[in-house]
C-alpha cells in the first residue's frame, strides 16, 4: 500500500512539474520511490543532503521532459493504462490521429476512446485484451482503428498490450502500443492479389500446355495413319518386279518423302511428350560398339560420294549398356547426319566410342562425333539445343530442317542421365560429346518416374556378372564366349516383346514399329550379335532403317536433264532447291514447254539472263537467294520486267502474298498443290504473255504507221504554230483595237456630250428667261415670253439634243454588252410603280396619237400585290426594259390604236399566254430560282412583226424595214439591250406576232426573288444629270401613314378634326389631310370650316380663315391627283376680311416620312420631285381631268381600298420628320418641272407669310385652273375637260430617266432646310385667271428647263467655284447658276489657279466646287486629290463638297470618280435644276449653316411686301408654297438647333 501511495504521490508530483500529468519512465519512477524511502525528514537533513535532493529532483524532471518529447515525436501509438484499463496518458500522434483532446479522455476506459469506434466487435476485443493484459498476459494482434485525419479515416495497426510489473511482481500499469501497418497491409493484399493472378495464369498456361500437347499427340496419331497407308502400299508396289521403271522412280520418291514426313511427325510427337513429362525409357542391354558400326555402315556410300574421310573408332571388346536402344540410335544417327550435312566435300567425319567414368563409383561411356565443317558460333553453343533453333534460320539458308534434331538429342541424353556438349575444333569444325552411364541410377527421382522396367536391379546384377565373366575370358584368351541367359519377368519365350510398359509405350516405337528387348546373357558377345541378326531382325532393321533414312536425305538426288529445244517451245525456268520437287515440276511442264531448271535464286538469275525464259516458276525459300529477292531483282531490270513469274510458297501468310503481288509476282501457288492447278496457272500466264506479246507486236506495227502520221502532224503542227503566232498577233491587234475602241467611245462620249452640254444648257437658260419674261443677256436682245415661235424652236432644239444624248447612251450600253461588261446592281423593286411611271412618260405621245393605254398591273389579291411590289432586281435596268417595250408599242401603233399592259404572278408559265419567239433558247422555267414567276405582257394592235423577221427581232442592229424609205427610225438596238437585261435577271423575253398589221405582243418572264431590304445596292454616291428615256425610281412616299378605308357615302370628304371653342385665347387646330383616291365619274368634296374666334391661333389645312387679330396657319397637305372623268369639288371658304390679318399658309405633308434610298446601277441621286402617275386601272386617254384643289396620289403610294365609291376620311395629320429627295433625269418637252404648287390666292389686305415651310410638295402644277367668281363662299366647280388641262398637268410631272443613277444617303429636309425646295408666289388681283397652258403633245425624252417663277432663288446665298477648261462652259454654267440664285461664282480654267485661290485665306471660300475631269496639264482628279490632302493636313478647314462634271458614263469611270474623293458625279449634258438640288443636298450633308436671324428678318420683309400687293376687297385664295416670298430673299432655312452663319444676298 505504501508503494502504491508513493507511486501515486510521485505521479501527482510529476503532473505538477511536467504540466502534462503523465508518467513516462517507469524505471525513473521506481528509482525515485527507492530514493525517497532512504531519505530523512527535511529537518534532519543537512545542507548538502538538501542540495543533493534538489539536484536529484531536477534530474528526474528533466528526464520526464525528455521522455515526453521523445514519445510525442514517435510515429507509433503509445499510451499508459492502469490495471483497470483506464487511460492515464497517451502520446500526441495518437491524439491527433483520433481527433481527441488529452484532458477529455484521461481517466476513461481505454476501449471507450474514439480509436476503437470502428465497430462494436473491435470495442469488445479491446476490452477483452485489456482484461487479459491486467492478468499479466502479453497481447498482440492486428486491427483497424480511427487513426487518421482527426478520426475520420481508418488505418490498420499492429496492436499490442504489455503489462508492467512492480517490485512485487504484480501488474501495476499496462503499456498499449500500435504501429501503422496500413501500407504494409495494402502491399500484402496487392501481393496476394498478384499471386492469385499468377496462380490463375499458371493454371491457365498449364491447361493450355496440356491442350497443346494433347493436340500434337492427336495430330501425330492422325498423321501416322494416312502415312502408314502411303508407306505400306508404296513398299508393296516397289517389291513388285513388274512395275515400270518410271513408275518405280515415282514410287521411290513417294516412299522416301513419306518416311521423311513420318520422321517429322515422330519428332513433333516426341516434343509433345517431353513437354508433358510422359516420355518413358524402354531399357535393354545393347552392345554399343555393334550399334555404332551398324549406323556408320549406312553412311559409307555417302562418304565416298562426297569424298569424305569417315572413320569409326570403338573398343575392341564388347561394351554392353542398359539404354533405350531406339532413342540412342536416333541420337547417334542425328549427330552423324549433321556432321555429313555441314561437312563440305573433301572433309572428314569421325565417330569415337570409349569408356568414360562419370564418377569414381559410376562407370559410363562417351561418344564423340566431330567434323571439319563450318562449326557453330560460340554464342550459339548453349541455345543451339533449344527447340526450333537453327544456326541459319533465314529463308536463304543452304540446309533445311525443322530445328528439332539437336533438341531431341539433348532431351534423350538427359533422360538417360547423361550430358551432351559442343565445342569448336581449333582446326575447324564442330565436336559433339555424349556422356552417359552404363546403368541407370535408381536413386534419382527422375528415373523413378521414367524407367519402366521394375526389375532393373536384376539387370544390374546380370551386367556385373557379365563384366566379371568377360574379364575372366579375356584373361584366358578364350575365342568363344558363353551366351548369357535371359532373365525377364513375365516372359517365357526367349525373344518376346516387353509388355510391361504403359499403353503409351506403343508410341515409343521406332519408325517401323519395332521394340527392343532386354536379353538375359547366356552366351558370349559374338553369339549375341549373331543371334540378334538371326532372331531379332526387327531391332537390327530398325537401326538400319533410321540410319538409311538419314543417308537418303543427304544423298544427292537425280536432277532433271533438259533436252534440246528442237520444236521451239516456250521456255519455262523452274527454280527449286529441292531436287525431287524440281524434277517433278520440270517433268510435269515438259509436256507443254521447254523446261530449264535452277536450284537457287542466284542460279535462277544467271539462267534468266542467259536464256530469257518466257515464264519463271520459282520457290520462295531457297539457299543463297530467296524467291522474293530474285523477283525484286528481276523487276528492277527493264529487260526482264515483262516476264511473268509464278511463285511457289509453303507459307500461308496473307501479308506475304500481298507483298509478293506488289513486288511484281504475276501469280502464286500454295504448297501442297495439285499438278492440274500448277499446269493451269502456268498455261494462263503463258497465254497472257502471248496475248501481250501479240498486242505489242501489233502496237509496234501500228507505231510505224503512227510515226508516219506523227511526222505529218508535226509538219502540220509547225504550220499551225506559225498560224498561231500570226493569230496571236491578230489577237493582240484585236485587243489593242478593242482598247482603242473603248477609248474612242469614251472620247466620243466626251466630245459629243460637250457640245450637247452647251446646246441643252443654253436652251435651258433661254427657256428660263422666257418663263421669267426677262432676257438671256439683258439689254435689247430680250426674248418675249409671248413669242411662241421662239419657245417652239428652243424646245425643238432641246428635244433633238436630248434624243441625240439618248442615242449616245444606247450606243454605250451596246458597247458594254458586246464587251461583256454589262452588269446589274440588285435591290428592291416595285414593279407596278415602274410601269406606272413608264406610262406617265409616254402619256403625251399616246394622246397625240389618240392611242388608248389600258393596264392591269396591281395583281390579284393582297399577297400577289405584295409580291409584285417587293422583288429583287436592277430598278434602273428594269425601268429601261419597260420604257423600251412601251415606247416601241407607241412608235409602231397607228392613231386611235390600243395598248394593253398586264402584270401578274403565276406558279407555272402557261403555254397559251407565253407565245412566240424566245430571246433565250436555253431558258428553262424549272430552275433553282423558285417555282413562281412574273409575267409582264405588252400587247398592241399596231404594225406587227413579219413572220420571217420574228427570229431576228432581238438581234442587235436588225430592223424589219432597213430601206431608205422606212417610216420608223432607230438603230435596232433597243430590243437587244432589253433581252440582255432580262437574261441577266435569269428571265426571258418572248416576241409574238400574227404578221404585219396584226399587232404584236411582248412578254417578259422573270423569276420571283423576293427583296429583303430597301437598299441592297452599291453604297456609292453618284449623281447622274444626263438625259435618257425615263428611269422611274421608287415613289416619293415609301409608306402611307394613314390607311384610308373608302366607304359608301354621299361623296363627301369631311376632314375636319377641329375643336371649335368660341372662347378667348383658344387654339383651334383644323388639320385636314386629303389622301383620297376617287375613281368615280363625279365626286363632290365639300369642305366647310367656319371658325370665328378672337385671339385664337387657328391651324387649318386647306382653309383660309381670316379673323380679327388672328394668326391663321393654313397647313396644306396636298399629295393627291384625281383621275376622274368629272370631279366637282365644292370648297366653301368663309372669309372674314379684316385689315392687318396675318395669314400663314404652311403646307405640311402630315405624318409621312420618306426614308428610302433608291439605289440604281450607277447610284445617281434623284432629288427631283415627282408626281405619281394616274391610276393604272383607268384608261389613260382623252378623258384625263385635273383639279388643283384635291390632288390624289397613286394607289402605289397609299394602299387605299377602292370600292368605286366616295370617301369619307377623317384623318389627323402630324408633322413630317424626314423626307427623302431623289434626283433623276427629266425629259424636257413633256414636263414643266415646277417644284412648287402655285395657287392663286386673291385676298384683300392680307399678309401672306409663307415662311418656315417644312414640306416638299410632290405635285408640280404649272397651270392655274380657272377659279373665277370666288366669293366668301367660294365654289371651285367642276372643271371642263379640255386636253390642254391634262397636258399642262402632265407637263408639270418630272419624269426620271432609265439611265443608271447613283443614290445619295437619306436626306432629311426638316433636319436641315437646305434640302427644302422653295416655292414662288404669284400674287394676282381680283378675278385673275392665270392659265399656263404649255401643250406639248409630242413624246421626246428631253431635258427640261427650270422655270423662272418657281426656281428663281433656288441657290440663294450659295458661293460656287467652277473649274473647266472651256470658256463657253464656264460662261454657260455661271449664267444659269446666277439665274438660279447663286450668290457668287468663281470660274477657273486651270486646276493650279483654282487650288491657289483655295489656299488664299483672304479669298472668299466657296460652299461647293464643280470641276470638270478632263482638262489640260492637271485634270479633275488632281484637283480633288490636292483638296482632300489639304483637308487632312489642316483639320480646322471645313470639308468642301465637290462634284465631278464629266461626259463619261461607264460604270468603271463612275466608280473611279467616287473612289477618288468626289462626292457626286454629274454627267453632261447637265440638267441645271437637278444640279442645283444636288448642290443644296451636298451643302446640307456637310452641315453648312446660315444665319437664322437674317432669315427671319428677311421673311418678315417678304411678308410686308406681300401685304402691299394685296389691297383689294375680294376674297382670293393665295397658297404660296415657297419658303422665301420676295424678290431678293436668298437665305436658306435651318433648324433652330444648329449654329447660324449670315449669308449675304447676291
Swiss-Prot record:
Enzyme Commission no: 2.7.13.3
SUPFAM superfamilies noted in UniProt: ATPase domain of HSP90 chaperone/DNA topoisomerase II/histidine kinase, CheY-like, Homodimeric domain of signal transducing histidine kinase, PYP-like sensor domain (PAS domain)
Q: What does this protein do?
A: Acts as a receptor histidine kinase for a signal transduction pathway. This protein undergoes an ATP-dependent autophosphorylation at a conserved histidine residue in the kinase core, and a phosphoryl group is then transferred to a conserved aspartate residue in the receiver domain.
Give the EC class as a word. Answer: transferase
Where is each Response regulatory domain found?
A: 571-686, 1359-1483
Pfam family example for this protein? HisKA
Using the record's annotation, list all stretches that form the PAS domain.
65-131
Which GO terms of type biological process are on file? Answer: sorocarp morphogenesis; sorocarp spore cell differentiation; sorocarp stalk cell differentiation
Asked whether the keyword Membrane is assigned, the reply is no
Instruction: Report the protein name in the record.
Output: Hybrid signal transduction histidine kinase D
Q: Where does the PAC domain lie?
A: 139-193
Coiled-coil segments on the chain, per record: 36-63
User: Which intervals hold domain Histidine kinase?
Assistant: 218-440, 747-1010
UniProt modified residues of type 4-aspartylphosphate = 619, 1412
Q: Name one GO molecular function term.
A: ATP binding
Q: Could you tell me which Gene3D superfamilies the record lists for this protein?
A: 1.10.287.130, 3.40.50.2300, Histidine kinase-like ATPase, C-terminal domain (3.30.565.10), PAS domain (3.30.450.20)
Composition bias, Low complexity = 1013-1031, 1042-1146, 1313-1346, 1501-1526
Q: Where is this region: Disordered?
A: 1013-1148, 1266-1285, 1313-1350, 1500-1546
Domain characteristics, as noted in the entry: Atypical domain architecture: contains 2 histidine kinase/receiver domain modules.
> Which reactions fall under this protein's catalytic activity?
ATP + protein L-histidine = ADP + protein N-phospho-L-histidine
Residues annotated as carrying Phosphohistidine in the record are 221, 750
Keywords linked to the UniProt accession: ATP-binding, Coiled coil, Kinase, Nucleotide-binding, Phosphoprotein, Repeat, Transducer, Transferase, Two-component regulatory system
